[in-house]
């Protein structure tokens, strides 16, 4: 085409456009404007992308930090044994089970902590008092190779949601700042690094809030359905917690419907608000139905929650409240006192930087009010347009309303009082108020942004932009140590307290390090009664009683023998010497292989060391049917030890090499019918009446086809000033050391 031809065609096209109908011109103009809008959107997305990448990196870093704390600070879990409940339930879900069925094993020996016992058709089954939602989340970590991975994922997801909420309530920079402020909260770090339902429930609540805001801004029913699903699952996870968090959003929804109806009636605008509200409500209601259906399956009554089946008086409301052996009259006055204490505790010791962080959050609230100063007043309602989307001021107001909803709502629940009483809140923070960290993080970030921007604006008004930036940077550097000091002050205490208990737990579980089991049975102590994994929640049988190891609580001789017979596994006894103080102080633990000796009789030899300054010795053989008392002849004594040779037969037990002095019956102490216990008690008395006692307890079965079965070695304990040695009495001396001269050696054989 020649230059002349091109010029001619261009002129012809221009003439046609001039003569074209206005509609065509308008269409072209509209198309060009759309292209321009799309181009601006692409440019804006390009600008936003770096902040979104930073937000993703921060969220992943938070998840990594929580994962590290889980494996470093809580390798044996915390001293709150509820973790074992959730992990038991998670293991059950991985095996497709809602119930534990002990079969022929006495259920009292293998009942996990906080499990409800139910008997259906003559079969005993047990289920957790907790919802299966959090255990299902934790099971994801196990599927990925490590239970703790789930904790990191939950923390990362929560941090990402807080970024979105901060961005919606203020801007993306506030959203970015909210993530490290959230991660700087001791309550967030410690609770997120443990296997409780609080962090997963908050993750679901934050997902609900973020989806709700998106639905309200875009009118998208899909986002509404996502919000409803999230809050419905949160209700299934922790019903009361979900309701308290959702109340401000429910209020916003009702206000939006009311304003839209009053303003335009059955208009497209009202129908849009109603449609997204129903999109939220219907999935939420559906999961309420799922919750009730789960109740019906496990408790037999859709309105009886497993929580209430375990402890009917352990719930919300005033009046008599009770769980296990603790009962209290929970009154409004007590609730007010507890709430006052927990508010102070929460805002001074468990948020990022303590009082400084609380002050920054207060500044953030003032910043939100300052931003709305021109839009508040009588005309605010008139400007409130639900059909136009949810403004940043509305998001900030709803987030702020979460604070009174949580604190006032939890005042109606006595659990906070119980947590303060038993010391768990001192170690792990006010975990019932975990949701309150979300608005605190967002408003804390807003406070930081407001102060920095205000300082920058002030500096730019009195000096050059470059000098203002330098001065602002210097100010941030100078203030950093103050912030770090405030953060260290709130983190140091609870972290050190939990680290101390982890050190004690490490000593407790030392016998299990680098040890694997195959078809084993391990008897565990019972300092808190017949509960498995309480307090030793690190030792769990898994999702059933057919795995590599079954843990059973040590009990009566009859029950222990029944457990041995029902399991037919290689048996061990895990025990300890010392006073169990909730892992505040360490104990000396021991894991011993058990043998079942069976024959016409069992002949045992026990050699004990003579404590320093001992002046006399007495020996007793005891059974439930009586006792015999013996003196020690010279032949059984050396300068440093006393040797006792004793025999356990099918009908009686006695000391062979000692001199009989008397007792409840005869030299031979009769055995009880069936399973029983034979105790050898050697007591040394010193000057002034001080004493040291050795006590050995042997579980025996005297009905073994005319012979006897004995579980060997016996439980051996040493104590001072009493002959009834418990676990707590086995530390001898002021620092947990035995008195000089104490030692124990034993051996046994079967006589046919």
What residue ranges belong to the model's regions?
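Start-transfer (signal-anchor) and selected internal transmembrane alpha helices
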Residues: 1-74, 167, 248, 252-260, ...
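Interfacial juxtamembrane loops and adjacent helix segments
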Residues: 95-142, 308-345
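Transmembrane-helix signature of polytopic, membrane-embedded enzymes
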Residues: 157, 162-187, 203, 217-226
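Hydrophobic, aromatic-rich transmembrane alpha-helices
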Residues: 158, 344-407, 444-447
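Membrane-interface transmembrane helices that cradle and orient dolichyl/undecaprenyl
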Residues: 167, 172, 208-223, 234, ...
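Short acidic/glycine- and proline-prone juxtamembrane loop motifs at membrane-interface regions
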Residues: 187-201, 240
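Membrane-lumen/periplasm interface segments of multi-pass, membrane-embedded glycan/lipid transferases
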Residues: 296, 301-371, 418-422, 426, ...
